[in-house]
């Protein structure tokens, strides 16, 4: 029997998880998804995600793939069954068949993240916003964000001692916009991201907004390719993976 590959489009609230990737010391999104698939398919099934979100980080859209040997699956039934088996804070939008060599991680052409900050104390969104207590200069922060387009090596914003072979990324979009009177959103899109990269960029841009770093300082931090020179990473609870893009030809 032939082996088919399927993409799962899902969302999750990362509050109570130790990130996407299976961990020895805590529950992960990947583990929950693999358990649900194993129950439904009645065999252990590996799941590969488009990326590895950190502990506490959310996804309004994540993509993962799995293989199945046997008769082609009814994708609507798979999605429906997974939603019954998964916890309330993980939801499957759809499942679709892709070409056998399609890869959720390596075939992704772009990923988009959003980071939310708020200027007010509000109990109902505290898990999804980073509260800022002092005024920020968003014009300066956007000026600094524009410099990201001029560089490709983002070692300064990468978690230290990771197993990645290259720190080269192509940034396609990076901008702060105001969502309402109290909420600002940083949207960033790139072909790939390094571990902790978005939170490190946000944390450093916040230092620019507070007047502790200039736009020139921000540029120098990138050029120094030294994580110790950049700002503290912003908390993970306000970060969302919101989109992953693929070339049309990988779909069946």
From Swiss-Prot:
It catalyses: uridine(38/39/40) in tRNA = pseudouridine(38/39/40) in tRNA. GO terms for molecular function: RNA binding; tRNA pseudouridine(38-40) synthase activity. GO terms for biological process: tRNA pseudouridine synthesis. The keyword Isomerase applies. Gene3D superfamilies: Pseudouridine synthase I, catalytic domain, C-terminal subdomain, Pseudouridine synthase I, catalytic domain, N-terminal subdomain. Transmembrane segments: none annotated. Its EC number is 5.4.99.12. Substrate binds at residue 113. Belongs to the tRNA pseudouridine synthase TruA family. This is tRNA pseudouridine synthase A.
